């Protein structure tokens, strides 16, 4: 029997999942602004993003549209978020300008 890796290759012990109001728009924002690599995007029957994986540097993060019927709400819907993410990049000024201009 094959052994299953406890932490999948390319992942870390903690992998954030972002719940957003418009998954497709958010994915394009992260791709255009931060240069993330889109690893996969799976849609539900209604067209919402059910699961997406994005990679920036050596880190993977996941993203999905909000699913209120499963109590998954975006920060926009609930009026904020108790969670923050720190993103480390080589040239912060360049990335800031790119993100600012891609809004």
Give residue spans per PLM region.
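Vicinal oxygen chelate
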Residues: 1-17, 27-28, 34-103
């Amino acid at each position: 029997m094959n052994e299953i890796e406890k932490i999948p290759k390319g992942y870390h012990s903690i992998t954030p999942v972002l719940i957003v109001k418009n998954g497709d728009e958010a994915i394009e924002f992260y791709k255009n602004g931060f240069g993330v690599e889109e690893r996969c995007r799976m849609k539900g029957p209604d067209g919402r993003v059910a699961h997406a994986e994005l990679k920036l540097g050596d880190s993977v993060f996941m993203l999905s549209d909000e699913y209120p019927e499963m109590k998954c709400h975006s920060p926009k819907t609930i009026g904020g978020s108790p969670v923050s993410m720190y993103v480390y990049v080589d040239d912060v000024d360049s990335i800031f300008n790119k993100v600012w201009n891609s809004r």
